[in-house]
Amino acid sequence: MNTHRLICATAIALALVGGGSSHAASQPSKYKGFTARVTNPWYPLKPGSVYVYRGVKDGQPSREVMTVTDRTRMIDGAPCVVVSDLLYLRGRLEERTTDYYTQDPRGRVWYFGEKTAELDRNGNIKNTSGSWLAGVRGAKPGIFMFTHPSPGQSARQEYYKGEAEDHFRVLRLDVPVKVPYGSFGHALMTKEWTPLEPGVIDHKFYVRGIGTVLERTAKGPLERNELVVPAGS
């Protein structure tokens, strides 16, 4: 995927969005008004912000460092903020990912792709599976966060057939959650799944003004990620 070049799309791909148990196509026909300045209170991406998470992945102690850069990139006609994500397992850098987010005029956060690379012990790229960019080879952007999430809302976060097909549904808005960074009484809880991993379900927890504070497996191999350093650090 690191050799992909952007192509111009003549029609904007549909993303499935809905409320209750149904999905509805609601992607705008154009990206007019989209901005790389992501200010959604449930997933703010202020340039310079750093989030550090610790947990368990693939049975190993993990550390993830997510940095919102001051860089932007046009993807399929939409201006996106560039976010760097580094995953360490047992202290060694295992995966390097660049994510692309944008916000529509209604305040919803959209996910427009990622460039991901698994690294070997020498730091060389051994796998780029899962990489995709909206508008390239049939890949479609998706909604990552609603402006005013409510239980039952659901969306497809990404679509690149066979590589990236994540979905999420809003479950609750009043969940108490405790992580190393602090305790919160009204977290947003979502359910995430993908048809590419049948039987695996994750729960994510978001706090207004911060973003993701906890991710854990609800069904499937144990994984957990907890916020230890807040945004702006």
Q: Where do the model's predicted regions map?
A:
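Sec/Tat signal peptide C-region and signal peptidase I cleavage site
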Residues: 20-24
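Bacterial N-terminal signal peptides
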Residues: 9-18
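Conserved functional acidic sites
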Residues: 25-233
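Bacterial N-terminal signal peptides that target proteins for export
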Residues: 1-9
